[in-house]
Amino acid sequence: RSQRAGLQGSEILSDPVRVGARAEIVLCAGAIGSVQIMERSGLGQVERLSGMGIRPRHRLAGVGENLQDHLQLRLIYKVSGVKTLNAQAKHWWGRAAMGLEYLLFRTGPLTMSPSQMGVFTRSSASVDRADLEYHIQPLSLERFGEPLHDFPAFTASVCHLRPSSRGSVHINHPSSLAQPQIDPCYLATDYDRQVAASAIRVTRGIVNQAPLAAYRPQEYLPGPQYESEEALVEAAGKVGTTIFHPVGTLKMGPASDPSAVVDAQLRCHGVRGLRVADASVMPTITS
């Protein structure tokens, strides 16, 4: 049975206002945001919504499921005999000099993208096409939001392009001010753990090549003490973080697929006048 879609929104910190639609509503809030709007509107898993006091309006078991993301493993190497952005950008005077150079000459670090090099390669000879991607940055930090290191270093960020792990996104409170519950389930499958371990080995092999020998690279993170398969998987969990590519939580597929939320025209199954047009509809993550 098809339901007619209606939109209920609210101004920030004010009473809700109801907005109708003469034709269609198109959700474009992303793989995290669109799920929250759907669930708070009563579209999703009936038991989950009922448990939070939300009146279920249409059962869609796939809402919030099938979350996929690229997990980047941030391997950091100390180097010698060369300057990196750690020295240039760590202190205010260095940042001021960078800004002045850009203003006067339109040159210098502020003209660069965050990553100066990208590489595609295979995690092993058994795969028929590249399944790893590198982003190389001439800087390093312990984790996002923290200061740059006080030693020269570069970061080799490597991610598995086609992970098999699947997570979920769901609301945990009816209020639109509440944060969602995001469970990415990184490295949840044997295959993903195997590729992660291989990615660290491949990175070490690249760094140990002759062209980099003059800079005497030393592995800082995760550290050379991680050697066995089990240890490398543990290391991947320590240095891994999102690369901000969440997709799949409102999966596209035929109505015969119980996990599908929208059809090939992005129309929500069973709900007239509602489409979703963002990365949440992607059945699988792209590389």
Q: Could you say what each language-model-derived stretch is?
A:
Residues 2-14:
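N-terminal low-complexity segments that are often proline-rich with Ser/Thr-Pro
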Residues 23, 35, 45-150, 207-210, ...:
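Mid-to-C-terminal "cap/lid" subdomains and adjacent gly/pro-rich loops that border
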Residues 29-30, 41:
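Glycine-rich, N-terminal phosphate-binding loop of Rossmann-like dinucleotide-binding domains
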Residues 36, 60, 103-108, 157, ...:
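Active-site rim elements
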Residues 118-126, 132, 137-142, 151-216:
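C-terminal segments that line or cap access tunnels to active or ligand-binding sites in enzymes
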Residues 13-24, 28:
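Core beta-strand elements of the Rossmann-like FAD/NAD(P) dinucleotide-binding domain
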Residues 132-143, 150-157, 210-285:
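A glycine-rich dinucleotide-binding beta-alpha-beta segment and adjacent secondary-structure elements
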